[in-house]
Amino acid sequence: MSKRLLLFDFDETYFKHNTNEEDLSHLREMEKLLEKLTNNNEVITVVLTGSTFQSVMDKMDQVNMTFKPLHIFSDLSSKMFTWNNGEYVESETYKKKVLSEPFLFEDIEDILHHISAQYNVEFIPQRAFEGNETHYNFYFHSTGNHNNDRRILEVLVRYANDQNYTARFSRSNPLAGDPENAYDIDFTPSNAGKLYATQFLMKKYNIPVKSILGFGDSGNDEAYLSYLEHAYLMSNSRDEALKQKFRLTKYPYYQGITLHVKEFVEGKYDY
């Protein structure tokens, strides 16, 4: 039997921010299933997230998650960590691919200043940045007009591309701690992002797209979910536009993942 690849967004997909006592039994059931499938050598489990690696570790500790996905792609999949001998180790091979082109904070600041001056808007850093980052993320608060927001952000993406930089935007997720009525603005190297990480794994493990199941809940999952044949948007997603585009999990959070992973490995989605 060939291996299958399971891909999970983290915040509000693999991890529920407001996990309560009732949720814990569903969480344990999900982890038990993933552990069993991993031990049977049936699946490779991967987290793809916009969060930092340390943020993922901290959140896993909050709910005492015990299962360790084989790979965690953090910082909008610009960093790759692999579980090896009881700890996560960053992949130097992936790092070299990501940093194969210049990626300078000064250039990104110039891009944002250009758009800020043109439209009299502000881009707010989401965290304190350190040297040699591979992911710079900002908030853009809505102007109050959705069409105007998109126009400004699409100009930003095009202008960044003209400067040989990759920018993405998606609606912020308040359930994951983001502000209301805002957008996430993400800058990564060209060789990064959830779709890039997916294709990297397909090549690494020689896994066809039909053998991949992906889950997500927000805009930064759209590109990679669109690429897959078997993709689910979490039914707990707050993105109404994405809900019209993707199949929804039958149940939210841990229950939804457990059900659809079971059906996937049982071959119910094969055709």
Curated annotation (Swiss-Prot):
Cited InterPro entries: HAD-like_sf, HAD-SF_hydro_IIB, HAD_sf, SPP-like_dom
Domain of life: Bacteria
One GO molecular-function entry: magnesium ion binding
The protein's Enzyme Commission number: 3.-.-.-
Entry annotated with the keyword Iron: no
Leader peptide range in chain numbering: none
Gene3D superfamilies assigned: HAD superfamily/HAD-like, yhjk (haloacid dehalogenase-like hydrolase protein) domain
Any matching Pfam family: S6PP
Top-rank EC class of the record's enzyme: hydrolase
Keyword Hydrolase appears in the UniProt entry: yes
Family: Belongs to the HAD-like hydrolase superfamily.
Protein name as annotated: Uncharacterized hydrolase SAR2294
Organism: Staphylococcus aureus (strain MRSA252)
